[in-house]
A protein has these predicted regions:
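Amphipathic alpha-helical interaction segments
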Residues: 18, 22-25, 43, 63, ...
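Metal-dependent nucleic-acid phosphoesterase active-site entry motif
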Residues: 1, 52-55
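Active-site neighborhoods of divalent-metal-dependent phosphate/nucleic-acid chemistry enzymes
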Residues: 54-106
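Glycine/charged-rich beta-loop-alpha catalytic/anionic-binding loops adjacent to active sites
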Residues: 2-9, 49, 66-72
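Hydrophobic core segments within long, regular secondary-structure runs in both alpha-
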Residues: 42-49, 65, 108
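Acidic, PIN/NYN-like endoribonuclease modules and their adjacent C-terminal/linker elements
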Residues: 7, 16, 20-22, 85-86, ...
C-alpha cells in the first residue's frame, strides 16, 4: 500500500490533532461493539501512540476552524473533512511539497483541487 509506505518513509509527518482523536474513537467503537478483541484494541492504541510520537501534531485553532467554515472546491463536505483540509492549508507550505494520505474520497477530491498530492 502506498499510504503505509508514505507513513513509514523518511521525512516529516504532520497530522491534525483531529486525526488522533478520530482514530482513538474509531478504535474504541470497534472494541465496544465487539469487532475487535481487547488485545487488538490495546495493539491498535499502541500503534496510534507510536504514530503520534513520530508526527508533529497540529492543534485545531480558531484560524483553522474559521477556514473550515468557508467553501472548498468540491462541496458539499462534512465539517471534519473541512477541518482536515483547513489544517493542510494552514501549514503554509506550497501544495506541491505536501502529500495528503487519505482513504476519504471527499478529502482526496478537495486535496487534488487545492493542488496537493494525494495517496
Amino acid at each position: 500500500m502506498a499510504a503505509k509506505a508514505s507513513i513509514r518513509a523518511p521525512g516529516q509527518r504532520i497530522t491534525s490533532a483531529l486525526t488522533i482523536a478520530e482514530t482513538s474513537r474509531a478504535v474504541l467503537r470497534a472494541h465496544l461493539s465487539g469487532r475487535v478483541t481487547a488485545q487488538q484494541h490495546r495493539a491498535a492504541l499502541l500503534t496510534l501512540q507510536r504514530f503520534a510520537r513520530r508526527c508533529h501534531i497540529v492543534s485545531v485553532t480558531e484560524t483553522i476552524l474559521t477556514r473550515a467554515g468557508r467553501p472548498f472546491p468540491v462541496e458539499p463536505i462534512r465539517t471534519l473533512v473541512a477541518i482536515h483540509l483547513a489544517t493542510a492549508e494552514a501549514l503554509g507550505e506550497p501544495p506541491a511539497l505536501v502529500i495528503i494520505i487519505t482513504r476519504d474520497i471527499r478529502v482526496r477530491e478537495n486535496s487534488t483541487a487545492l493542488g496537493f498530492s494525494v495517496e
